[in-house]
Curated annotation (Swiss-Prot):
Alphabetized GO MF terms: leucyl-tRNA--protein transferase activity
Keyword annotations of the record: Acyltransferase, Cytoplasm, Transferase
The organism's taxonomic lineage, starting at the top: Bacteria, Pseudomonadati, Pseudomonadota, Gammaproteobacteria, Aeromonadales
NCBIfam families with a match to the protein in the record: aat
Catalytic activity: N-terminal L-lysyl-[protein] + L-leucyl-tRNA(Leu) = N-terminal L-leucyl-L-lysyl-[protein] + tRNA(Leu) + H(+); N-terminal L-arginyl-[protein] + L-leucyl-tRNA(Leu) = N-terminal L-leucyl-L-arginyl-[protein] + tRNA(Leu) + H(+); L-phenylalanyl-tRNA(Phe) + an N-terminal L-alpha-aminoacyl-[protein] = an N-terminal L-phenylalanyl-L-alpha-aminoacyl-[protein] + tRNA(Phe)
The protein's name: Leucyl/phenylalanyl-tRNA--protein transferase
Organism (species): Aeromonas hydrophila subsp. hydrophila (strain ATCC 7966 / DSM 30187 / BCRC 13018 / CCUG 14551 / JCM 1027 / KCTC 2358 / NCIMB 9240 / NCTC 8049)
SUPFAM superfamilies in the cross-refs: Acyl-CoA N-acyltransferases (Nat)
Catalytic activity, EC: 2.3.2.6
Function (record text): Functions in the N-end rule pathway of protein degradation where it conjugates Leu, Phe and, less efficiently, Met from aminoacyl-tRNAs to the N-termini of proteins containing an N-terminal arginine or lysine.
Length: 235
């Protein structure tokens, strides 16, 4: 199949087949468009997500291979288990979405900023208000210390970003997501791409075609009705 970069129409929420994505940079498929809820949902349902540096135009990606985690197969190492047993924390869902995405967008120790621009923040906050985007929060003594956010598509959760102000906080947020999602019939977490952090948690790399086929099936299947009800999570 031929590979090319597509310029998106500003009005039509359409995307090309992800199999046309470039090999280098891996998965770059399209440029332009906007971050409207309709376009974002159309993208995620096709296995496409936006990512660009603040100085770049809006770019859309569908990498091959695709990083995924099956919730019931999350790897919890000995050190993490000890941390979970020995640390006092509270875990919640959708209690502080705005604060989580703002923390994810804040500069990191190793970089001057992140890819999460103000338009990105506004777009995902709108998806949250519409019931599509959700967050997991880790609290200690009433202070938000870690969390993650992403989109729910049926039995698939598309993870977007996470942050942590404490050791193992981001891993704890992932454990909470996987256990909660699995208990409510969730089947797959899309992590987009492999990295060293996710490798410690048991991420798998699937060929893009396998991921897209599975996404098409699972995104049409319902979760338990109360999966994303605001409240607390128990591990």
């Amino acid at each position: 199949m031929s590979r090319y970069l597509t310029q998106l129409d500003d009005e039509l929420c359409w995307f090309p087949d992800p199999e046309h994505a470039l090999e280098e940079p891996n998965g770059l498929l399209a440029i332009g468009g906007d971050l409207s809820p309709a376009r974002l949902l159309a993208a995620y349902h096709k296995g496409i997500f936006p990512w660009n540096e603040p100085h770049q135009p809006l770019l859309w990606w569908s990498p091959d291979p695709r990083g995924v985690i099956r919730p019931e197969q999350l790897h919890i190492g000995r050190t993490l288990r000890k941390f979970i047993r020995g640390t006092s924390f509270d875990i919640s869902i959708d209690r502080a979405f705005n604060e989580v995405i703002a923390a994810c967008a804040a500069p990191r120790r190793s970089a001057s900023g992140t890819w999460i621009s103000t338009p990105m923040i506004d777009a995902y906050r709108q998806l949250h208000r519409l019931g599509h985007a959700h967050s997991i929060e880790i609290w200690q003594e009433g202070q938000l210390q870690a969390g993650l956010y992403g989109l729910s598509l049926g039995r698939v959760f598309c993870g977007e970003s996470m942050f942590s102000r404490i050791d193992n906080g981001a891993k704890l947020a992932m454990v909470a997501l996987c256990q909660h999602f699995a208990r409510h019939d969730g089947a797959l977490i899309d992590c987009q791409m492999q990295n060293d952090f996710l490798a410690t948690l048991g991420i798998e790399e699937w060929p893009r075609r396998q991921f897209l086929t599975t996404l098409a099936q699972l995104s049409r299947q319902p979760l338990a009705a109360n999966c994303w009800q605001t409240g607390s999570i128990l591990l």
